Amino acid sequence: SKDVMHQMALKFGKPIKLLQQELGADDSVVKDFLD
């Protein structure tokens, strides 16, 4: 979800799109990473 990506962006102080590129992130990957 966008909410999860937003939390990631806040946590790492990076733009959401940059995080998605770095992680190759889809929601499941991001959620696993946050949990």
UniProtKB/Swiss-Prot annotation:
One GO term of the biological process aspect: response to pheromone
Q: Which UniProt keywords are present, listed alphabetically?
A: Pheromone response, Pheromone-binding, Transport
Which Gene Ontology molecular-function terms are recorded? pheromone binding
Q: Subunit structure, briefly?
A: Homodimer.
Q: What does this protein do?
A: This major soluble protein in olfactory sensilla of male moths might serve to solubilize the extremely hydrophobic pheromone molecules and to transport pheromone through the aqueous lymph to receptors located on olfactory cilia.
The family annotation for this protein states: Belongs to the PBP/GOBP family.
This protein is called what?
Pheromone-binding protein 2
